[in-house]
Amino acid sequence: MSFVILVVLGLIAGTVGSLIGLGGGIVIVPSLMFLSTVTQLFQDVTPQVAIGTSLLVIIFTGLSSTLAYIKYKTVDYKSGLIFFIGSGPGSMIGAYVSKLFNSNSFSVWFGIFMILISLSLMLKAKARPINKAHKGIIRTFQDDAGEPYTYSYQASVGIAIAFVVGFLGGLFGIGGGSLMVPAMMLLFLFPPKVAVATSMFIIFLSSMTGSVSHMISGHVNWLYALALVPGAWFGGKLGAAINRKMQTKTIVMIMRIVLILIGCQLIYEGIFS
C-alpha cells in the first residue's frame, strides 16, 4: 500500500514540478511529513529524511524534464551552467544547515516558505519584466518554432541569486525553481518557457550536490525514493508536455491557493502542536 501511495505522490510531484518549474519537492516534502502524522507506514519520516529523500527524487524529475525540454529546444545550457556555479555550493550549505531543524521548527519555517512561494508565483503572473538595455552576457535564443528571443544578465548577479535559490533548495528539499523562474523572467527577460526549462536543468544539477550532502548524513530513505522515482520520472515528462501545449494560469492559481492553505496549516501545527 505504501508503495502505491509513493508512486502516485511521485507522479503528482513530477508533473506539477515540471509544469511550472518548481521541481516537485514542494509536493513531496509536506506530503511525507503529513503521512508521517496520519499513518504508521511512514512513522520514521523526520524533516531531514523528507528533505534528503525529496532532493534525491528531484534529480530524476529534473533529468526527465530536462530531456523532454531538450526535445523542444527550450533549455539554455550556458546560462544554466553559469547559474549552477552559485546554486551548487548553495544547495550543499543548505543541506548542512537543515540538520538544525526539529519537527516543529521545520513546520513553521517550511509553512512560511510555502506562503512566500505562493507570493512568488503571483509575482510571476502579475509583474512585467524590467525594461533595461542588454548588457553583460547577452543571449539570443530560438525555439523549435523558430521564434527568436534576446535577453541578458550580469553573471555575478545571476550567480548570487542562484546561490540563494540553491541554499533554500538544499534547506527545504524543494529544488528552488519557484524562486529562480520569476527572477529569470523579470530581471533577465528570459522567455517564460525557456525560464521554466532552464530552471529544471539547474534543479537537476543542484539537486545532485544537495542530495549528496544528505546521503552522507544518512538523511535518505532509499525505499521511499525507489517508489517515488518512477512516478516522478514519468511526471516530469508529462509536465513538460502539458507545459508545451496549454496555458498554465489556472493550474498556477490553484497551486497558489493550495500552497497558502498548506503553509498556514504547517505554521499552526508547528506553533501549537
Swiss-Prot record:
InterPro entries recorded: TM_pro_TauE-like (IPR002781), TSUP/Inactive_protease-like (IPR051598)
PANTHER family: MEMBRANE TRANSPORTER PROTEIN MJ0441-RELATED, MEMBRANE TRANSPORTER PROTEIN YJNA-RELATED
Membrane topology: Multi-pass membrane protein
Keyword Cell membrane: yes
Cellular localisation: Cell membrane
Species assigned in the record: Bacillus subtilis (strain 168)
Protein name: Probable membrane transporter protein YunE
Segments traversing the membrane: 3-23, 50-70, 81-101, 105-125, 157-177, 185-205, 222-242, 251-271
Cellular component, GO annotation: plasma membrane
Keyword Coiled coil set for record: no
Gene: yunE
Family of this protein: Belongs to the 4-toluene sulfonate uptake permease (TSUP) (TC 2.A.102) family.
Alphabetic keyword roster: Cell membrane, Membrane, Transmembrane, Transmembrane helix, Transport
